[in-house]
Structure formats: C-alpha cells, structure tokens
Amino acid sequence: MSGKGGKAGSAAKASQSRSAKAGLTFPVGRVHRLLRKGNYAQRIGSGAPVYLTAVLEYLAAEILELAGNAARDNKKTRIIPRHLQLAIRNDDELNKLLGNVTIAQGGVLPNIHQNLLPKKSSKAKASQEL
C-alpha cells in the first residue's frame, strides 16, 4: 500500500499550472508573486491573482483585436504603435481608461476643425447645377 492513501502503483497526475486550470494564457503565478512583492496588501487571496490575470488578458486581447483591425485598414500586416494609438483613441471606453497614457511613436488622431474647412458657397452649387 502506498503512503498517500491511494491505490498502490497508480501513476501520479502531472501538475497543472493555475493558468491552465483557469484557462488563461497569462501567468497567474507571476501575477500572484508581483502582488505579494508589491506591498499592495498584507495578504493576497488565492482568487485575486486569477481574476486580475483574466482582466489583463481580456484587455490585451481587446486592444490587439482593435489594433489588428487598424493595421488591416492601413493595408499592413504588422501592428505598430500607430495602430495601437488609433485603436485606443477611436474606442470610447479604452480612450477613457487610457486617457492619460502617452504611446511612443503613436502620433495623433487626424482632425481638422470645422472652421478651417472650405465653406460651401451658393455660387459653387449654382455652377454645378448648370
């Protein structure tokens, strides 16, 4: 008989990471370690790093999805900081969340004030109608 109370001779199950258990790609163990080392609280619950990792993974996926769409709109196959900037600034919620963030090499959104645009005159309309 084995010392662990199980059946004798049964193979031990391979260990599974917390990321794999939660179905995540981002590392739960690393986030847990960073929460402990960061002195955010005296104690860190076991569910907190899993939840935080899931939120971080979701945000990263959302931003990359929008940046990929921006890259495709510009006929590019590689995401550059400009595409990240366009993705974040054109999305209301992400822009609110990352409003104070500066993205290096991101540029600005194209915007021309209405007063600077050429005025539509009635003479131009009359000449077009003839």
UniProtKB/Swiss-Prot annotation:
SUPFAM superfamilies per the UniProt record, alphabetical: Histone-fold
Gene Ontology BP annotations: DNA repair
In-chain residues carrying the UniProt-annotated modification N6-acetyllysine: K4, K7
Matches recorded under Gene3D superfamilies: Histone, subunit A (1.10.20.10)
Subcellular locations according to the entry: Nucleus; Chromosome
Primary location group: nucleus
Annotated motif [ST]-Q motif, positions: 127-128
Modified residues (N5-methylglutamine): Q105
Record site feature (Not ubiquitinated), residues: K119
Keywords carried by this UniProt record: Acetylation, Chromosome, DNA damage, DNA repair, DNA-binding, Methylation, Nucleosome core, Nucleus, Phosphoprotein
Sites of Phosphoserine modification: S127
GO CC field: CENP-A containing nucleosome; nucleus
UniProt PTM comment: Phosphorylated to form H2AS128ph (gamma-H2A) in response to DNA double-strand breaks (DSBs) generated by exogenous genotoxic agents and by stalled replication forks. Phosphorylation is dependent on the DNA damage checkpoint kinases MEC1/ATR and TEL1/ATM, spreads on either side of a detected DSB site and may mark the surrounding chromatin for recruitment of proteins required for DNA damage signaling and repair.
Disulfide bonds: none
UniProt miscellaneous comment: In contrast to vertebrates and insects, its C-terminus is not monoubiquitinated.
Stated family: Belongs to the histone H2A family.
Role this protein plays: Core component of nucleosome which plays a central role in DNA double strand break (DSB) repair. Nucleosomes wrap and compact DNA into chromatin, limiting DNA accessibility to the cellular machineries which require DNA as a template. Histones thereby play a central role in transcription regulation, DNA repair, DNA replication and chromosomal stability. DNA accessibility is regulated via a complex set of post-translational modifications of histones, also called histone code, and nucleosome remodeling.
Domain notes: The [ST]-Q motif constitutes a recognition sequence for kinases from the PI3/PI4-kinase family.
Quaternary structure, from the entry: The nucleosome is a histone octamer containing two molecules each of H2A, H2B, H3 and H4 assembled in one H3-H4 heterotetramer and two H2A-H2B heterodimers. The octamer wraps approximately 147 bp of DNA.
Protein name, per record: Histone H2A
Originating organism: Kluyveromyces lactis (strain ATCC 8585 / CBS 2359 / DSM 70799 / NBRC 1267 / NRRL Y-1140 / WM37)
Lineage: Eukaryota, Fungi, Dikarya, Ascomycota, Saccharomycotina
